[in-house]
Amino acid sequence: KNVPNALSGTSACAFYLVPPIDSKDANIIYINNNRVESNEMFSTLAHEGYPGHLYQTNYFLSTNPSPLRTFLHCDGYDEGWGTYAQLYSYNFTEFKDVDEKTQAQLRQLYRDNDLLSLSLSSLSDLYVNYKNYDENALADYLKTYGIDKSATKQLYQYVIENPVTYLSYSIGYYELNKLEKEMAASLGKSFKISDFHEAVLNVGSCNFAILSQEIEKETEILSKIP
């Protein structure tokens, strides 16, 4: 659905509404057309829909968890998975009239661009809310990356109104990426990315200390499979 015009100025680019536990089929994604360009729709829907939040939520609900778990959410896990799914989805993008090597490079370019944008936003959040940067100081920092004053003003206002929000996306992603690498290193040639995804989704939303313990247990189980 489209975000109503009256709310578009303050709404996020897109968001997924978690369905009630007694109405699991009510899965709705809202798109803010004033903030999402058509060429961003693929990654946006990957983050909010499949294999992002919508898939994550419905997968976990299919495990028949305690109803209490539906109230317990950790933003780092949730937005980390959404970002992980968004970046992973580029593995399935196709570009016209390019060879395999160029296609792989373009996919990586899209991932790197998303990560750079997210990392700069997260650093801006820290500089403003922790190091007390004012708008001019932030503009001086961001202009070295080609970001103009208009974009800086919007970002400055956002991180003031929503402190540490960006960090749940960036740190959440990097935590998941670290766990994936650790599992891959432990299992070697027997590592399958689907096993990692399943292990993460089976645990559900939690802090990374718990998730790390559960991934370690699953890794030990998988290592004993001949």
Regions found by a protein language model. Give the residues of each.
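Long, His/Glu/Asp-enriched segments that create or flank divalent metal/ion-associated functional microenvironments
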Residues: 1-226
